[in-house]
Regions:
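Bacterial N-terminal signal peptides that target proteins for export
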Residues: 1-9
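Cleft-lining beta-strand/loop regions that shape enzyme active-site pockets
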Residues: 165-337, 372-374, 389, 394
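Boundary at the C-terminal end of the N-terminal hydrophobic targeting segment
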Residues: 20-22
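Extended, small/polar residue-biased N-terminal targeting/export presequences
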Residues: 44-121, 176-204, 393-395
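Conserved PDZ fold ligand-binding element
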Residues: 33-38, 136-159, 247-248, 311-314, ...
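PDZ domains, with a preference for the canonical peptide-binding region formed by the helix
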Residues: 60-63, 137, 141-179, 233, ...
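Bacterial N-terminal signal peptides
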Residues: 8-17
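PDZ/PDZ-like domain segments forming the peptide/carboxylate-binding groove
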Residues: 106-156, 225, 347
Length: 395
């Protein structure tokens, strides 16, 4: 072969390679991920090493699903919480969009929901939290029910139910392992996830008589935003005022608690007694001074862990459940050109000189979870109520 042909062959090869990359619609979003990690990840050395290793990875993706798989497989190499990839149309994308709606400048965030948090496990999809007064609760779905199918098709995610919004929909569930499946009719609705969590928090508010004590309870599926803290503060001063103790459910969901959350339990604030002209005494306190139980598990993360760590350290609460996630970094959502979201850890966080990332917070009373086929039972909550009742001083 003539030596004069070599430059032409090399040029043609280079053009083919360039053309192959240009033809891939996933090269650009892949490069966006790499650039964000390189320039914004909280650990610059790890970020640079990861970015160098994965430069151009998007070009090999053959579909949006394949790109998502490749990205989700690569990000864990950074070994950091608050670092994940959420494609459009997924529950995580909707949740993060709702939490950071103002930051992302989104005019509206609405997704299908049945009013339940569904967990995917090796055994299948199980109802982890059934939000009080929601469509699933009204239809009879219980914690621990396994979701088998929707309108005869295998269940994949609630986010995929767009075509069933406002339509009575047949959900086939398995309540007991090996038992005959049951069909529930649930009507999915469009909701803003953050608004749904706030409604669920309010609906969960109750005071129960337990072992001779009045124990208050509220679920904070998410703590992201002042509305959630305000909702708890309102309950502590109103619905819970005559309760003897309180259980705050921090399990699963999202973090986001502001450090000012701790002010709700500041015992340095004095208690007052108003005395009327008839001599009647009316005790009042601006903060909660009675026993507190924080119910946590391996998915209690971020701001919830900061609150749990601090309240335990100061003797303000007893922790019941399971060791927390150890996911305490500051993260920010970054929108890619595809509309997908990259959630990236951008700062480390110390709490009183302690790094909780990768460490978490141990509980005072360990209670294993028992989700699959629970038939509505919740042993962790039962134990939390026991501990709260036992913490009330004798009259």
């Amino acid at each position: 072969m003539s030596k004069r042909l070599y430059p032409s062959i090399l040029l043609a090869t280079a053009l083919l390679a360039t053309g192959a990359h240009a033809a891939s619609p996933f090269l650009k979003p892949g490069d966006e991920v790499v650039d964000h990690v390189r320039s914004r990840f909280y650990d610059p050395k790890r970020g640079e090493a990861w970015a160098t290793k994965h430069q151009g990875y998007g070009a090999a993706a053959t579909s949006a699903d394949d790109f998502a798989r490749r990205t989700q497989a690569a990000l864990p190499e950074l070994n950091a919480s608050h670092t994940a990839f959420y494609p459009r149309g997924t529950t995580g994308h909707a949740d993060l969009s709702a939490i950071f709606q103002r930051h992302l400048k989104l005019p509206k965030v609405e997704v299908p929901s049945i009013g339940a948090d569904i967990q995917e496990t090796p055994q299948g999809f199980f109802a982890r939290h059934v939000f009080a007064h929601g469509p699933a609760a009204k239809a009879g779905l219980l914690r621990g029910d396994r979701l088998l199918s929707v309108e005869g098709k295998p269940f994949t995610s609630v986010a995929s139910l767009t075509q069933r919004v406002n339509k009575p929909t047949r959900f086939t569930i398995e309540r007991t392992l090996g038992a005959e499946p049951t069909v529930l009719t649930i009507t999915p609705r469009l909701v803003n996830p953050k608004a749904e969590w706030l409604d669920a928090q309010h609906a969960s508010t109750r005071v129960v008589d337990h072992q001779g004590r009045r124990v208050a309870y509220q679920q904070l599926y998410s703590c992201a935003g002042p509305e959630h803290q305000q909702k708890l503060q309102d309950a502590l001063s109103d619905d819970f005022a005559q309760a003897d103790a309180v259980v705050i459910d921090f399990r699963d969901g999202w973090g986001g608690c502001n450090p000012t959350f701790l002010n709700l339990f500041n015992r340095a604030v004095p208690r007052f007694v108003g005395i009327g002209r008839d001599g009647r005494r009316n005790p009042w306190s601006a903060t909660w001074h009675k026993p507190v139980v924080l119910l946590v598990n391996g998915n209690s993360r971020s701001g919830k862990e900061i609150v749990a760590f601090t309240m335990k350290r100061l003797g303000l609460a007893t922790l019941v459940g399971q060791h927390t996630a150890g996911a305490v970094l500051a993260g920010t959502p970054l929108r890619l050109s595809t509309g997908d979201l990259l959630y990236l850890a951008v700062e480390a966080v110390e709490v009183e000189g302690v790094l909780l990332e990768g460490v978490g917070v141990p509980v005072d009373v360990e209670v294993p979870d028992a989700l699959p086929y629970a038939s509505g039972k919740d042993p962790q909550l039962d134990k939390a109520l026991d501990v709260a009742a036992a913490a009330v001083p004798s009259p």
